[in-house]
Amino acid sequence: MIKKIAVLTSGGDAPGMNAAIRGVVRSALSEGLEVYGIYEGYYGLYHNKIQQLTRYSVSDIINRGGTFLGSARFPEFKDPAVREKCVEILRSHGIDALVVIGGDGSYMGAKLLTEEHDFPCVGIPGTIDNDVAGTDYTIGYQTALETAVEAIDRLRDTSSSHKRISIVEIMGRHCSDLTISAAIAGGCEYIVASEIEFNREELIKQIERAIIKGKRHAIIAITELLCDVNELAREIEARVKHETRATILGHIQRGGTPCAFDRILGSRMGVYAVDLLLQGKGGYCVGIQNEQLVHHDIIDAINNMRREFKADWLAMSKRLD
């Protein structure tokens, strides 16, 4: 029977993680469990940065961005000897199970602890990229979306005033959910998504045709890592003879007060993760599909399940141009 659980946040931070931590802590305490917080993710676990938490430890954090437990990259966790030491540390505290909040890399760590050491872990999807399989939404995505849309709205104001083309680079790595959704909500004229081949020449020709028709300004939304957006801006300006500037939103998308959706989602997922552990269901990850909380085998979430590209959304955006 589980008596003590721990919780950590790993990888890139996301608004709403604190709500998930709070959900884990308070729901576990309500069931008579002891709860421990692991500071700075897997790095902190390896260095024994573990502290018992009370309900007051998570007071007044639901409205705060980031994660009060902190997070860190820890590539050394790939070493089996490092993982073995981490399990030894957990067991030295009498901890029976672990809740991991993060993205696919964090899930991989939880998967290895479960597979190699039969240590019960449950994953909660926390990343602004919305790129975790087995869930419609990840914690932090909606807040990051609002941040990106606000930035696009501001860029439109100044682009309109100066007859300028603006390129806005949006986070997401290999998943363009954030880019496509922000572009539709912000009324962007062009979308460059990571899931489809980037045809630079076709993009420039589209802009040229629009300018010939009298368009005064435009906004191009592009997913990060596809190209050097500043270089692209210079090329567009040289070709179409229209002032063009690039804006990289960067880590501003990860910060800020979490929206109500992410606070509620984090709370629900935190409680659900504890319920799974109480039912003896380690090795799973939490998700939300069609507004219902669900769980999947964490191995399937990593190896077999793939998020569907929003191709229909992208097609719709072209009809709205």
UniProtKB/Swiss-Prot annotation:
Any idea what this protein is called?
Answer: ATP-dependent 6-phosphofructokinase
The domain of life for this entry's organism is Bacteria
The record lists substrate as bound by T127, I128, D129, R164, M171, G172, R173, E224, R245, H251, I252, Q253, R254
Location in the cell reads:
Cytoplasm
User: How does this polypeptide assemble, per the annotation?
Assistant: Homotetramer.
- Which CDD domains does the record match to this protein? Bacterial_PFK (cd00763)
Sorted alphabetically, which keywords does the UniProt record give? Allosteric enzyme, ATP-binding, Cytoplasm, Glycolysis, Kinase, Magnesium, Metal-binding, Nucleotide-binding, Transferase
**Gene name of the encoded protein:** pfkA
Pathway(s) this gene product operates in, as recorded in its UniProt entry:
Carbohydrate degradation; glycolysis; D-glyceraldehyde 3-phosphate and glycerone phosphate from D-glucose: step 3/4
Swiss-Prot/TrEMBL cofactor(s): Mg(2+)
Any one GO MF term held by the record is: fructose-6-phosphate binding
| Active site feature | D129
Q: Where does Mg(2+) bind?
A: D104
Ligand binding (ADP) = 22-26, 55-60, 156, 187-189, 213, 215-217
The main location is cytoplasm
Listed GO biological process terms: canonical glycolysis; fructose 1,6-bisphosphate metabolic process; fructose 6-phosphate metabolic process
* Function recorded in the entry: Catalyzes the phosphorylation of D-fructose 6-phosphate to fructose 1,6-bisphosphate by ATP, the first committing step of glycolysis.
Reaction catalysis annotation:
beta-D-fructose 6-phosphate + ATP = beta-D-fructose 1,6-bisphosphate + ADP + H(+)
Quick one: a GO cellular component term? 6-phosphofructokinase complex
Q: How is its activity regulated?
A: Allosterically activated by ADP and other diphosphonucleosides, and allosterically inhibited by phosphoenolpyruvate.
What PANTHER family does the record point to? ATP-DEPENDENT 6-PHOSPHOFRUCTOKINASE (PTHR13697:SF4), PHOSPHOFRUCTOKINASE (PTHR13697)
